[in-house]
Structures are given as structure tokens and as C-alpha cells.
Curated annotation (Swiss-Prot):
The keyword Membrane applies. The keyword Protein biosynthesis does not apply. It comes from Escherichia coli (strain K12). Pfam families: ThrE (PF06738). Induction: Has 2 promoters, 1 of which is repressed by H-NS. Activated by LeuO. A monocistronic operon. Residues 1-113, 159-168, 216-228 are cytoplasmic. It comes from the Bacteria. The transporter is composed of YjjB and YjjP. Involved in succinate export with YjjB. Both proteins are required for export. Contributes to succinate production under both aerobic and anaerobic conditions. The chain crosses the membrane at residues 114-135, 141-158, 169-189, 195-215, 229-249. GO terms for molecular function: transmembrane transporter activity. Disruption phenotype: Deletion of yjjPB decreases succinate production in E.coli by 70% under anaerobic conditions. The gene is yjjP. This is Probable succinate transporter subunit YjjP.
Length: 256
């Protein structure tokens, strides 16, 4: 019976870590919460090894070890899932949930998804505000809003069809630069600063992965940090390729 319980707790601990890693948590948090959950559910110790595409976790109880491995598939950044997992771990630490209760709560976790139109609208507004704050004027803000909102919607459609992220970023950057650049060619916007073109692709800056990459490397998770840095760099490169393609094909004036 004790072995069966340890096996169940091991599955829950690695599921906890997998939830966090799949939805954008830093490696230190993945390690900490999976260990805390195991100890809260009666394990003597929990050891884990985290990489960008897998987790290996071992629980130790009365000298008996059980090890489990799970592959990691990126499911996109979603802090709602991360906070839900944190809440469940805290409940287990306060003995408000046993391992069966934790298993039930884990099965009920669903990523929070906002409507596409709302996400595209808010992204457009944020990019337009950046343009206005950087002396782009109201006319530049209007161009940025239209270009970035359309580009974000295109990005969502491509992601829904499971297009490779690098190709997705490249095509989205191409669309955003094309829309903003062609609008700047109109006589109405002849005096509009070209910062509008740069601001329209801000939605593609991989800020969260870069922050997590630096945090991982500072906290000793070098391999995971370098992997995240490489992925973010490839996304940035794909964005640059898309921008240069649009500038070259349409003969648009540059950002300066």
C-alpha cells in the first residue's frame, strides 16, 4: 500500500512540474514546487532534473526510491495555470488536500483563454501607446494600432493551425511591416514618423522567454536557460527576416 501511495505521489509531483514547465514558469519554481508538493504529501525527499524538453523526478520514502520521466511539450505562456498549481501546493502544505484531493484538483486545471478579438485589440492598443510615447503622434498611433491588431490576429490564426513558431513570427512580422509601411506611403501620412513601423512589430518581442532564460542561468539552471535563450533568439531572428522581407519587397523606407 505504501508503494502504491508513493507511486501516486511521484506521478503528482512530476505532473506538477510538467504543468509549470509547459506554461512558462522558470526552472527554479518548477523544482521548488514539485519538491514542496512531495514533502507535503509525505515524502522524505524529492529530487528532480529539468531540461527544456523533459523532466526526471525521484521521490524518496523510507529509503525507497521511485523515478519517473515525462517529455515536455510547450503549451504557451499561461500564468493562470502556474498560479493554480501554486495554490494547490499551498493547500497540500496546510493539510487541506491529500494526494487524492491533489489529483482531483490537477485534473480540473484548464488554461484561461481570452477571446481572440480581445487579445488582438489589447495588443494593438499597447503597441499604439508605445508609438505615441515615442513621438509617433496620433497619426502614427492609428497606423500602429491597425497594423499590430491585424498582425496579432494573423498570428493567432497561424498558431491555431499549428504552424512552426519561427515561420509564424516571420509571416506575422512581414504582415505588420507591410501594413504599416504601405499606410505610411499614403499622402495623408507622408509626415508621420516611421516609428509607427517599428512599433507595429513589438508584439513579437519574446520578452518572457528571455527573462526566464536569464533567471534560469542566474539560479544555476544553465542548460534550460541556454535552451530558452536560443529559442527566443531564433524567434527574434525570424521576426527580423520578416521585417527585412517586407522592406525589400515593397521598397519601404526604413525605421529611421
Amino acid at each position: 500500500m505504501q508503494t502504491e501511495q508513493q507511486r501516486a505521489v511521484t506521478r503528482l509531483c512530476i505532473q506538477c512540474g510538467l504543468f509549470l514547465l509547459q506554461h512558462g514558469a522558470e526552472s527554479a519554481l518548477v523544482d521548488e514546487l514539485s519538491s514542496r508538493l512531495g514533502r507535503a504529501l509525505g515524502m522524505d525527499s524529492v529530487e528532480s532534473s529539468i531540461s527544456s524538453n523533459a523532466i526526471v523526478l525521484t521521490t524518496i520514502k523510507d529509503g525507497q526510491c521511485l523515478t519517473s520521466t515525462r517529455k515536455n511539450h510547450d503549451r504557451g505562456i499561461n500564468m493562470h495555470v502556474v498560479t493554480e498549481v501554486q495554490h494547490i501546493v499551498i493547500l497540500a502544505e496546510h493539510h487541506l488536500l491529500d494526494y487524492k484531493g491533489v489529483e482531483k484538483r490537477f485534473s480540473q486545471i484548464q488554461p484561461l483563454r481570452y477571446p481572440r478579438w480581445l487579445v488582438a485589440l489589447m495588443v494593438g492598443l499597447s503597441c499604439a501607446c508605445f508609438c505615441k510615447l515615442n513621438n509617433g503622434g496620433w497619426d502614427g498611433a492609428v497606423i500602429t494600432f491597425f497594423a499590430s491588431t491585424t498582425a496579432m490576429y494573423i498570428r493567432q490564426l497561424l498558431a491555431q493551425r499549428h504552424l512552426h513558431p519561427q515561420i509564424n513570427f516571420c509571416l506575422t512580422a512581414f504582415a505588420a511591416t507591410t501594413i504599416s509601411g504601405l499606410l505610411l506611403q499614403l499622402p495623408t501620412f507622408s509626415n508621420t514618423p516611421t516609428i509607427a513601423m517599428a512599433a507595429s512589430v513589438l508584439l513579437l518581442v519574446p520578452g518572457f522567454p528571455l527573462i526566464n532564460a536569464v533567471a534560469d542561468m542566474f539560479k544555476g539552471h544553465i542548460n534550460t536557460g541556454l535552451a530558452r535563450w536560443a529559442i527566443a533568439s531564433l524567434l527574434t531572428l525570424a521576426t527580423c527576416v520578416g521585417v527585412v522581407m517586407a522592406l525589400t519587397i515593397w521598397g519601404l523606407r526604413g525605421w529611421v
